[in-house]
Amino acid sequence: MSAIVDIIGREVLDSRGNPTVECDVLLESGVMGRAAVPSGASTGSREAIELRDGDKSRYLGKGVLKAVEHINTEISEAIMGLDASEQAFLDRTLIDLDGTENKSRLGANAMLAVSMAVAKAAAEEAGLPLYRYFGGSGAMQMPVPMMNIVNGGAHANNSLDIQEFMVMPVSATSFREALRCGAEVFHALKKILADKGMSTAVGDEGGFAPNFSSNEECLNTIVQAVEKAGYRMGEDVLLALDCAASEFYHEAEDVYVLEGEGLKLSSTQFADYLANLCDKFPIVSIEDGMAEGDWDGWKTLTDKLGKRVQLVGDDLFVTNTKILKEGIDKGIGNSILIKINQIGTLTETFAAIEMAKRAGYTAVISHRSGETEDSTIADIAVGTNAGQIKTGSLSRSDRISKYNQLLRIEEDLGDIASYPGKSAFYNLR
């Protein structure tokens, strides 16, 4: 038995300089697991609640001392002595202890830090790499990365309404090759922007954040960068978008307002707008193409593009099996974004991935805009054979830490490692 003998919660900083929760879990054998949780900028309204102190005299109210206190007192008392290898039982203990639908009492940030730290300690105790502990002997598929090389929306202070413009290397035969492709495109884009006198400052997720006149101009510039780096757009590299449409949806008027382009569009018109972009560019994936509450708009978008484009629900599904099941039943989207802090425990995270796969939906493992050096999501991506990961651009060590962990995992897997390329989109025609 891997009995838990000590738990320590602490307040640390994330990549935006805001407080977040870190937890150490010590086992009877002397083995320790440590985990730190991320935080989002554009968040879904039905996400599990991240507990903040609200004390304006500390960190502008964003302190997490209450969440840390919960770890060091009642959570510690509830799980002390439990077997760290019984992840599902431990997570259920946390959920029952919290007692709310959205984890608002203890805080999803406190609960997730403990859930992750316990898993890491148990993996260490078992002498297994974390991805192998999660996935057993069947974990061998590396993920295709969605690399966010241009940031807009809530992730940057510029004129772009769409939040993320991403490249996906699909012709590579290994993750290492895919990472090199992304890095070379990133540097080619930097040179193009610099030559045009445009900003090469980066946003929260490490992508560039220049002012473009339109989303099309941005996409055209990315195409130039791909070609400048020596790759074929549409063959070697595909494009992906995160619209984060909830951020520019005006519910009272039922319109999508693209301020950067001076457009006010109905759901149907915005679906047509996105379809037009897909006709002009090799876009294989669109995340949050409609607002989280606009299910009619989502249905319109799915009917229009769902057979040829991966339509990823982030704010829509918030890694929640109840909401995902409703979406599956109604034929909304065809993919789910998996963010561990949206739901607050590893067990519930794995349940959402499993439900998606059973329904023929893809699952994309994702970071948050406020990250830490914790690289657990890299191990989750491989451990669940998810096939796709979204963890930022090719700059900022809070993003690179995940890519570097994936390089280590691929090296550890050796000849049995596989890279899915275009087959990651197994539900598209």
From Swiss-Prot:
Cysteines paired by S-S bonds: none
Q: Which UniProt keywords apply?
A: Cytoplasm, Glycolysis, Lyase, Magnesium, Metal-binding, Secreted
Q: Which cofactor does it need?
A: Mg(2+)
Q: Which SUPFAM superfamilies match?
A: Enolase C-terminal domain-like, Enolase N-terminal domain-like
For this protein, what does the record note about how its cofactor is bound?
Binds a second Mg(2+) ion via substrate during catalysis.
Q: Which Gene3D superfamilies match?
A: Enolase-like C-terminal domain, Enolase-like, N-terminal domain
Q: Which GO terms describe its biological process?
A: glycolytic process
Instruction: Give the residues the record marks as binding (2R)-2-phosphoglycerate.
Output: 163, 339, 368-369, 390
Q: According to its UniProt record, which reaction does this protein catalyse?
A: (2R)-2-phosphoglycerate = phosphoenolpyruvate + H2O
| Pfam families cross-referenced by the UniProt entry | Enolase_C (PF00113), Enolase_N (PF03952)
List residues binding Mg(2+): 242, 287, 314
Q: What is its EC number?
A: 4.2.1.11
UniProt family annotation? Belongs to the enolase family.
Under what name is this protein listed?
Enolase
What organism does the UniProt record list as the source?
A: Cupriavidus pinatubonensis (strain JMP 134 / LMG 1197) (Cupriavidus necator (strain JMP 134))
- What gene is this protein translated from? eno
